[in-house]
Regions:
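Active-site/substrate-binding loop(s) of hydrolase catalytic cores
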Residues: 1-117
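Active-site-adjacent mobile loop/cap segments within catalytic or ligand-binding domains
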Residues: 94-96, 103, 122-168
Length: 168
């Protein structure tokens, strides 16, 4: 029996407000209790094409301090997934440090380049935390397009992902 768990958003406040940070101004993707977590300010890249593209936010009072981060960590420990695909934007790539079979499939299905790194440090990120606990995590970074265009371009591939299985 194959089972999939889909978390629609880890940041409901940010989705509602159109922001990366939660309601407390914390960048949740720098708040995970990863070994590389850093206190203080963090930078995120909001647009890979713009000249002024880095925005400064906070990482939280301590690793895993935010309820949203805690909830996702608890879920991961509860369900013990074999792998995770985390969807983001706007860097237009599939980030898979291990260049796994799934990462290669995603790159083809989404017609995005497969990269080993997004090109800048991501301390306290979900991917860093997953690496610390030995959970394969691939980050699918969509390009900066509207929700309608993303649905048109990627919905079929996202549905196909639910049926993906290794060929080994």
């Amino acid at each position: 029996l194959r089972r999939h768990h889909v978390v629609l958003t880890v940041n409901p406040d940010g989705c509602q407000l159109g922001l990366r940070a939660n309601a407390r101004g914390i960048d949740l993707n720098r708040n995970f209790p990863a070994a590389n977590w850093k206190a203080g300010e963090t930078v995120y890249r909001w647009n890979s094409a713009a000249e002024e593209r880095d925005v400064v936010l906070l990482t939280g009072e301590e690793p895993g301090s935010e309820p949203e981060t805690q909830a996702l960590c608890q879920l991961i420990h509860q369900i013990h997934p074999a792998w995770v695909v985390s969807f983001h934007d706007p860097l237009a790539c599939i980030e898979d440090p291990g260049h796994s079979e799934l990462g290669q499939w995603l790159a083809g299905a989404f017609n995005l380049p497969l990269v080993g790194s997004v090109g800048y440090e991501t301390p306290g990120s979900f991917g860093s935390w997953c690496a610390d606990i030995g959970l394969p995590c691939i980050t699918a970074e969509f390009p900066p397009v509207s929700a309608d265009e993303a649905t048109e371009k990627y919905l079929a591939a996202m549905t196909d992902l639910l049926h993906w299985h290794t060929h080994r």
